[in-house]
UniProtKB/Swiss-Prot annotation:
Family the entry assigns: Belongs to the pseudouridine synthase TruD family.
CDD domains according to UniProt: PSTD1 (cd02577)
UniProt protein name: Probable tRNA pseudouridine synthase D
Record flagged with keyword Isomerase: yes
KW Signal (keyword) present: no
Top-level division of the source organism's lineage: Archaea
EC numbers for this chain: 5.4.99.27
Domain TRUD: from-to ranges: 162-382
Record keywords, A-Z: Isomerase, tRNA processing
Known role: Could be responsible for synthesis of pseudouridine from uracil-13 in transfer RNAs.
Gene that encodes the chain: truD
Matching PANTHER family: PSEUDOURIDYLATE SYNTHASE PUS7L, TRNA PSEUDOURIDINE SYNTHASE D
Disulfide bonds: none
Amino acid sequence: MFYINIAYIFMDLGMYGYITKTEKLNGMIKSNPEDFIVEEIPFDIKKDDNGKYLIIKARLYDWDTNRFVMYLARHMNISRKRITYAGTKDKRAVTTQYFCINTDRMFSGSINGIEIIEQFRSNDIIKLGDLYGNRFLIKVDYPGDLEKDSSETLKEINEKGGFPNFFGVQRFGSMRSNTHYIGKMIIKGEYEKAADKYLYDDNFDTEEYRINYGKNMDAKNSLKEYPGNLTFERSILGAIASGNKSSAFNALPKNLSIMFVHAFQSYLFNKMLSERMKHVKDLKTVIEGDLLYNIDDYFNPDKKRLIEANRYNLEMLNNLSSMDKIRPVIPLPGFDTRMPDGLQRDIMLKVLEDENVSLQDFKIPGEYSYMSSSGDYRIISAKPINLKFPEKNKLDFILGRGIYATSFLREIIK
């Protein structure tokens, strides 16, 4: 049995330090998909027998969202651009998700590892982010009683404003956590190096076919060796083999290519949050110069207005934060990012300097302009909702959209 040690701090992904001071528990999450169950909590989708869209509620066993969409499009003989969904999910899990398909047909047949729970028609299109959050049911391999032994940590998490809202390991690749390196190469214009890194990374790869590519850089021969299920890698190889190495990422679906840039932004966010935790005692404290969002009961931010903390409103904002009505945010850097002031500005400038990148690097010219990012903002902490332990060492809880269960478990287990 292969195990993933959640306690391991992926320094390489910008996550270091904890907000709690309790002891390490040495727990692990098994890599069996059945030990990590995720179910979307969608916005209301109105059924209409004459609706324009087909809505599928599907349970995916060990399927990456992007790969499933590609297979679903192929199965239904339509363009993948006609399929939308609310959020991407990790491969090593059992996930229940909703997919919206612009087609007048219903789904028929079967796909291995997919259970179609329900399908119906609707006039409501599903867009990225169209969900309240996700419910998780996670089994932890732990020799003791996790509910009892984590009680002090959970109390401290609540008192300190939640757990650090790090982007989890899944953000950086299902199996090879290197997408942030590729994203950095892309924004720096190193497109050929980025393509090579996608195909072979000596920090992760042990498969003979990847090693052979790294040694020989022979795309035509590698097309004979790379397994058929590595569809995206084979698309990159095909582009290189035809002499278009610098343009190779155009062979991927655009939303997948953009995720490389998003991964690098996520890495920068993680580093900035880690640095903030060195200087600020908890995750609910608002300091002068902070930018903030209002949040709902799921810790989902209201992005219509950024609030800036100053000496006149600081006390009020800290009171609101202590009631979980508001939270400081850290930018995901982009070419149009509004910088915070004070300590958080200093941290951001230092991280960008250390990485040798500027905000304008995220405005990508030419054929890859679609990967450009104006930036975004992410709250620094969140709390689990309705946390229960239905069985020994099994956790049942809800998190808002885009919040990683592995980041919550990391703080508990260390």
